[in-house]
Regions:
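Short, hydrophobic secondary-structure boundary micro-motifs
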Residues: 34, 108-111, 170, 197
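Short hydrophobic/aromatic patch on the recognition helix
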Residues: 42-53
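Basic, helix-initiating cap at the start of DNA-binding domains
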Residues: 1-28, 32-41
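Amphipathic alpha-helical packing segments from all-alpha helical-bundle domains
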Residues: 116-164
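C-terminal peripheral helix-coil segments that are non-catalytic and often amphipathic
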Residues: 148-222
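Hydrophobic alpha-helical connector segments
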Residues: 77-112
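An amphipathic alpha-helix adjacent to DNA-recognition modules
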Residues: 14-22, 31, 52-80, 90
Length: 222
């Protein structure tokens, strides 16, 4: 009679699969990562992997959280500062862009891929497997960070700007502004992907400045 795996044994298997996937993300294109290859690298049969994860795409998204480390650390530092809602908003987006343009394929798949509406569950599962990698954020930043999808994440930090001096946001146009911001971010991310494919150099600082300028144009009145 087979013994049921202990929570520690189960977590160890989960870690093996996630680490194997993370290493493959660093080495291969996303379209070359398959369940069988992940299972082989982790030292298990592919049927074992299916008993723990929905599919390869979910596992790739889960393993991608590791590449949010610098962004998450920046948010932890930001949490210790007493910034206004508006300054907080711009700083969060600046940190986000700097990291996204550094890892465009990972961020594009994570926020616009198959499981881009499962982000809360993905973050929670990842940090339950790797608790030492989780940084402490303020309650407001944490709520944004683990938001269900990019639309909710952005809206969560955009809404507090409604009615503030110097911006054009109100209850009627905030959803439109949110959609414009996300669409522009996605377009820039796609641009970076094309540059990478053509082996062109990408200036992440310049692209981030470009995004931030457009962000202010969408929100501010002057």
């Amino acid at each position: 009679m087979a013994h049921k795996a202990t929570p520690e044994q189960r977590n160890e298997k989960l870690r093996s699969f996630v680490v194997a996937t993370r290493e493959m993300i660093e080495q291969d294109d996303f379209d070359k990562i398959h369940i069988r290859k992940i299972a082989e690298k982790a030292g298990f049969h592919n049927s074992t992997l299916y008993s723990y994860f929905k599919d390869a795409e979910y596992l790739i998204s889960l393993a991608s959280v590791k590449f949010f480390d610098q962004y998450s650390r920046s948010l932890a530092d930001l949490s210790d500062k007493n910034l206004s809602e508006q300054d907080n908003f711009y700083e969060i987006w600046r940190f986000f862009c700097l990291n996204a343009f550094m890892f465009p394929e990972i961020y594009y798949n994570f926020f616009f891929g198959k499981h881009s509406d499962d982000l809360t569950a993905i973050f929670e599962e990842y940090y339950s497997i790797f608790p030492n990698e989780e940084y402490k954020h303020s309650s407001k930043i944490h709520s944004m960070y683990v938001g269900k999808n990019i639309n909710i994440r952005c809206l969560d930090i955009l809404k507090p700007l409604i009615g503030l001096d110097g911006n054009r946001l109100n209850e009627e146009n905030v959803t439109i502004a949110n959609s414009l911001i996300i669409a522009y971010f996605k377009a820039l991310l796609e641009q970076v992907l094309v540059y990478r494919k053509d082996n062109k150099e990408v200036d992440t600082d310049d692209l981030t400045t470009q995004f931030m300028t457009t962000l202010e144009f969408i929100i501010k009145t002057d």
